[in-house]
Amino acid sequence: MFPLIILISFSLASLSETATGAVTNLSACLINHNVHNFSIYPTSRNYFNLLHFSLQNLRFAAPFMPKPTFIILPSSKEELVSTIFCCRKASYEIRVRCGGHSYEGTSYVSFDASPFVIVDLMKLDDVSVDLDSETAWAQGGATIGQIYYAIAKVSDVHAFSAGSGPTVGSGGHISGGGFGLLSRKFGLAADNVVDALLIDADGRLLDRKAMGEDVFWAIRGGGGGNWGIVYAWKIRLLKVPKIVTTCMIYRPGSKQYVAQILEKWQIVTPNLVDDFTLGVLLRPADLPADMKYGNTTPIEIFPQFNALYLGPKTEVLSISNETFPELGVKNDECKEMTWVESALFFSELADVNGNSTGDISRLKERYMDGKGFFKGKTDYVKKPVSMDGMLTFLVELEKNPKGYLVFDPYGGAMDKISDQAIAFPHRKGNLFAIQYLAQWNEEDDYMSDVYMEWIRGFYNTMTPFVSSSPRGAYINYLDMDLGVNMVDDYLLRNASSSSPSSSVDAVERARAWGEMYFLHNYDRLVKAKTQIDPLNVFRHEQSIPPMLGSTQEHKYSSE
């Protein structure tokens, strides 16, 4: 933590020393280029409302956290191009925010020493569906929920494969891959992108052909904030039945009981038919002692099994009871509905029992209620975990009432799509992915260090049971514990093209976590970064560094 504390201090110092002239220059440039929707720290009346609207992890809302000098909300591609031009001209670092769900706050906080701005894409959220071609264009600021809603308005037999959080921005989600309940059937969100419009650091609007296949490959799964700003994605619509089945299955019990179910789950779920996804959310029971131990079988762990099946309830019951009788799925634990209703059912808009208002227009809401403080980490499991290993999971989980685990099953299309098809590499050979989470509220924030140490200790305890050499991680669940390249960015900005050794060092240092996220695809991502953004204009604490080598200074033009 020591280097991070030092860099936070540098960032705060740089903020306090930001020249009034630089602020004036950027403000004037934006206005001269017809960009009028922006707020300035700390004088603009609505600055903090804008900052916090899409700030989803309250760990980064603390007063001592670095603040952007500007928050800019472009509403057209012309304004977006002008925004990039003006920010570069005034020497402001750019952070791009779509939905603000970055696990480490990289879309709205910078620990670099430079003054920075947020380019917020919330005004670029149009979704245009073309059923004839079974495609849609979604602007980079559209949320997943907005995409789902737009599709459902014109078809009840089409869907898109993405995550369950409707307020998550498509720009970041698709850039990192985008796993969801349809991924075993259709692959990731990024697997279903057929074209894109990318605005690079030189203000060029590039489609797939213009950007080239290496860059188009990189923007699908290579992580957000690296390549430029995606103005829009062209996505493939996916055929689904009119009726699907959802299940929420609760099986609270002792650690021994839950471990037995999980031991079977890890074998069954990767081999289910592709139409069937069965994930698990685990949390400590956290019950009063008289309730927890009042029965002969103690309730220590509370598992929630979430199932989506692309077909009728009768088939769900038949398949589950044949392949996984230990779970004992009951008729009243499952419901038939349309696909878009299932998206609402599994979203944060539903209550703990999956109940919702049934109003699918709620999927368009951008603001997320119930924000909290959280820290996440990820792993991939390639070999079945023993009963003792499962018990180890649960013993560690029980230690923290603010902790929980999410198990996402792989197999199906995730096995069939090549690990080099897009930049996201975690494919065949993975049984399931693990997400570790500690989440707390303001009243508990005095315990934040305890929760952070718990999740790091849990992660270390899991080492024998998960992938290795390298240990895998998912870029959409950023984890700064794996390393940061703030020093690398400083070197890159100050290195000359005739002295490439610093860029080589930066690439090699970033390899430590870059290969955890991208495995063997890391070097190709460096190549793509060097091609599209050699001056490292678009960067954050875990972005892909370019190689400098023969790079020449680009002359930026807004024309």
From Swiss-Prot:
Pfam families: BBE, FAD_binding_4. It comes from Nicotiana tabacum. The keyword Flavoprotein applies. Its cofactor is FAD. This is Berberine bridge enzyme-like A. Involved in the biosynthesis of pyridine alkaloid natural products, leading mainly to the production of anabasine, anatabine, nicotine and nornicotine, effective deterrents against herbivores with antiparasitic and pesticide properties (neurotoxins); nornicotine serves as the precursor in the synthesis of the carcinogen compound N'-nitrosonornicotine (NNN). Catalyzes a late oxidation step subsequent to the pyridine ring condensation reaction in the biosynthesis of alkaloids. One of its GO terms (molecular function) is oxidoreductase activity. The gene is BBLA. Disruption phenotype: Strongly reduced nicotine biosynthesis but accumulation of dihydromethanicotine. Inhibition of jasmonate-elicited formation of anatabine and other pyridine alkaloids. Residues 64-240 form the FAD-binding PCMH-type domain. PROSITE patterns: FAD_PCMH. Pathway: Alkaloid biosynthesis; nicotine biosynthesis. Disulfide bonds join C29-C86. It comes from the Eukaryota. Glycans are attached at N25, N37, N321, N355, N494. The modification Pros-8alpha-FAD histidine is found at H101. Transmembrane segments: none annotated. It is found in: Vacuole. GO terms for cellular component: plant-type vacuole. Belongs to the oxygen-dependent FAD-linked oxidoreductase family. Residues 1-21 form the signal peptide. Its EC number is 1.1.1.-.
